[in-house]
Swiss-Prot record:
SUPFAM superfamilies: Zn-binding ribosomal proteins. GO terms for biological process: translation. One of its GO terms (molecular function) is structural constituent of ribosome. Keywords: Ribonucleoprotein, Ribosomal protein. It comes from Ignicoccus hospitalis (strain KIN4/I / DSM 18386 / JCM 14125). It comes from the Archaea. This is Large ribosomal subunit protein eL40. SMART domains: Ribosomal_L40e. GO terms for cellular component: ribonucleoprotein complex; ribosome. Belongs to the eukaryotic ribosomal protein eL40 family.
């Protein structure tokens, strides 16, 4: 069931989608991270996301 309430959409984006992914080991890291928590690499990218329902 898609989320339509704008307040809930903001919560979902913050809790689920706003993460950094380590390019070296693939670990998910918090949005404010500068280094990977698992391998200590600084090669992080934002998680790719599109908010919407399944196709």
């Amino acid at each position: 069931m898609p989320v339509t309430d704008p307040e809930l959409v903001a919560i979902v984006q913050k809790r689920v989608l706003k993460k950094y992914v380590c390019r070296k080991c693939g670990a998910l890291n918090p949005w404010g991270a500068t280094k990977c928590r698992r391998c200590k690499s600084t090669n992080l990218r934002p998680k790719h996301y599109e908010l919407g329902g399944k196709r």
